[in-house]
Structures are given as C-alpha cells and as structure tokens.
C-alpha cells in the first residue's frame, strides 16, 4: 500500500503526531494509500521552511531563474500527465477522459507563468506636481498559504502556485484530506524541476 509522507523543506517527513489516515478509491471503496495527518506543529515547520527559503534568496531571485524553473516543471508535467491523470481518477473519482485533458492543460499553466515571471513590472504614474515622481513596484508578498478543495486538486494547485512562484513567493499547500495523494505526488515533480528546498511545502 502506498504511503505518503509530508513534503517539508525539500524532504519527506513523518507527521509530528505519528497519525495517518486512509484514502479510498471512490470507484471501489478500497483503501489504496495512507496519508500523513498533519497538525499545527507540522504547519509551523512548513511555514518556517518557506520563510527561510523566501528570506534565503528565493524572494530576491532573478525572475528569469524563476521562469526557467516553472517552464522546466511544465515539461515534467507534460511527461507525467497520463500518470497524474490516472492518480487523480484513483484519488477523487473523476472520469479518465476528463483528467487526461486536464492534466495536459496543467503544464500550460506553469509554462504561461514561467514566461510571465520576467515581465512583471511597475509603472510610472504621471503627476503635475513639480519635484515629484510617482511609480509602482511589484514585490513578492512572502509565504503564501494555498488551500485546495477535493474536486480538481492539481488544477487548483496550479491556479494558485504558478503565479505565486512566478512573483517570487514561497508556498505552503494544504490539500483536501479527501484528495491529498495527487498533490503529494506532485511534490516529486517540484523536486525534480530543481526548486530550492522550502520554496514549496
């Protein structure tokens, strides 16, 4: 039986509580995996790792670097789309035909924001006041929390994670306890793409 630990600071870890919960295949009702049950202590570790990664260089990293990592992740998603689609079917009961198309689209979302990362810019705001200069400058927020529902885990992670990373934020993802497996499996792709430890937890 598959067992999914938590992904915190670039490493797979057991939950602080030592507790696990079952995930069932909605088609058969059979338990097919055990998922780590996170608690406040685990969340604190994840947020601390994300904060350290943000302050340790990710927040000031070159946008072109962030864009390259996002595009690399998109390529990996394209390669793994069929497997991810089947995993989502097993985890949440969606139709394979729907998931086949949806997982192929997910890579495009990361590719789009990868291309946008080095195009985030401020603007100069005209003023009629002498000796005054108005402008906007966009900066990353820092650590962001991404809570995702059960119905389309990977797609909804993409909607939130891709723009957050492109802008220079770090993230802590809290997937639905009903469909956690695909999000946890996705962390393998994050690691393969080369994101620094703690950027995504």
Language-model features, listed with the residues they occupy:
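Terminal low-complexity tails and localization/encapsulation signals of metabolic enzymes
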Residues: 1-35, 68, 72, 122-147
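Short glycine- and Lys/Arg-enriched binding-loop motifs that mark or flank ligand-binding interfaces
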Residues: 6, 14, 89, 111, ...
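Histidine- and aromatic-rich ligand-binding microenvironments
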Residues: 7, 22-25, 34-45, 194-201
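Alpha-helix N-cap/helix-start motif
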Residues: 16-17, 43, 81, 99, ...
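Glycine-rich loop-to-alpha-helix module at the N-terminal edge of alpha/beta enzyme cores
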Residues: 30-120
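Rossmann-like NAD(P) dinucleotide-binding subdomain of oxidoreductase/dehydrogenase enzymes
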Residues: 122-201
